[in-house]
């Protein structure tokens, strides 16, 4: 029996001070104030500018710290790739001739081939449902891919894979890639880390493709259950913010939800309609509807 964890985008977050070790559950308001240097560690008094400042950490009761529980859980991932994880793909397809020339000039002969192999061998990432949805919102804001649709994948791990002991810091480099040989020891395919960017304090996994048994995927956002209506365009950034403010979602998610619309709103060339906003809100406020859709999909063996 697989474990489906409770989904709560608005739950309190656990913070741990890197200097004194103090841990405390805090609200979204506290975290927002902390990031603006308006809060101090209640034990040692440092603020967010210090290298060993307080950071999100995992709950000591999180079942993901127990190896056999990790293998029984559903994990999630969002991607614009319709058949993730791909077995056969050529990363060079996304490179323009100008990029290839630049890489060769700056990094020498064979640079493109080396980069290609790194892209093919880099770790895959899965996490909580909340982390997967928030990752999609961040990518929509920071790495817009035009009209490329997103897919939500529910991931089942192979029961026989080895899990690296402990829960660690995220092993990615400055562009978000992680090479398994740098953090996985022989016999292990799964690496737990604290996610500090999405669903802060949750445990995510960096893993190799052979750790995955199967995936079930749906395109998101899905059609909402709101009544049919005439298309209404979001003409300005202020319109987007107002609609997000009216949405029934936790405060901590509102900036991320609005941020997903910023690139298109700022360009003023292609305005998003309310159906997309309703669909994104539905992913957050009615996850049971989304999980039911995933239940209806035949898992694909990897």
Model-based region annotation:
Residues 69-93, 99-104, 148-302:
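Active-site and NAD+-binding cores of ADP-ribose-processing enzymes
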Residues 2-10:
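Short, intrinsically disordered linker segments that flank or connect zinc-binding domains
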Residues 21-26, 48:
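Cys/His-rich microdomains that often coordinate metals
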Residues 9-13, 37, 109-185:
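ADP-ribosyltransferase catalytic core
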Residues 28-38:
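Short linker/helix segments within small regulatory modules
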Residues 61-125, 129, 133-142:
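Glycine-rich loop/turn
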Residues 17-20, 41-44:
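Short cysteine-rich clusters marking metal-coordination/redox-active sites
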Residues 45-58:
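Short metal-binding segments enriched for Cys and/or His
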């Amino acid at each position: 029996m697989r474990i489906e964890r409770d989904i709560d985008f608005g739950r309190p977050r656990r913070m741990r001070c890197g200097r004194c070790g103090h841990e405390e559950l805090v609200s979204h308001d506290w975290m927002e104030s902390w990031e603006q240097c308006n809060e101090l560690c209640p034990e040692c008094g440092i603020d967010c500018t210090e290298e060993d400042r307080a950071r999100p950490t995992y709950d000591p009761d999180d079942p993901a710290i127990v190896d056999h529980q990790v293998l029984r859980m559903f994990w999630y991932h969002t991607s614009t790739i319709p058949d993730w994880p791909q077995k056969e793909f050529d990363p060079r397809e996304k490179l323009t001739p100008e990029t290839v020339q630049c890489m060769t000039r700056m990094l020498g002969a064979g640079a493109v081939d080396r980069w290609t192999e790194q892209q093919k061998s880099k770790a895959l990432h899965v996490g909580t449902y909340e982390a997967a949805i928030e990752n999609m919102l961040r990518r929509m804001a920071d790495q817009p891919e035009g009209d490329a649709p997103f897919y939500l994948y529910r991931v089942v791990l192979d029961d026989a894979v080895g899990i690296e002991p402990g829960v660690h810091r995220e092993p990615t480099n400055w562009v978000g890639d992680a090479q398994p040989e740098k953090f996985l020891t022989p016999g292990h395919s799964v690496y737990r880390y604290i996610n500090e960017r999405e669903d802060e304090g949750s445990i995510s996994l960096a893993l190799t493709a052979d750790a995955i048994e199967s995936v079930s995927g749906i395109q998101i956002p899905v059609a909402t259950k709101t009544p049919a209506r005439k298309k209404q365009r979001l003409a300005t950034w202020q319109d987007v913010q107002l609609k997000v403010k009216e949405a029934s979602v936790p405060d901590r998610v509102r900036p991320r939800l609005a941020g997903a619309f910023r690139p298109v709103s700022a360009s003023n060339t292609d305005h998003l309609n309310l159906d997309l906003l309703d669909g994104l809100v539905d992913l957050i406020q009615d996850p049971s509807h989304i999980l039911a859709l995933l239940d209806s999909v035949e898992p694909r063996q990897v």
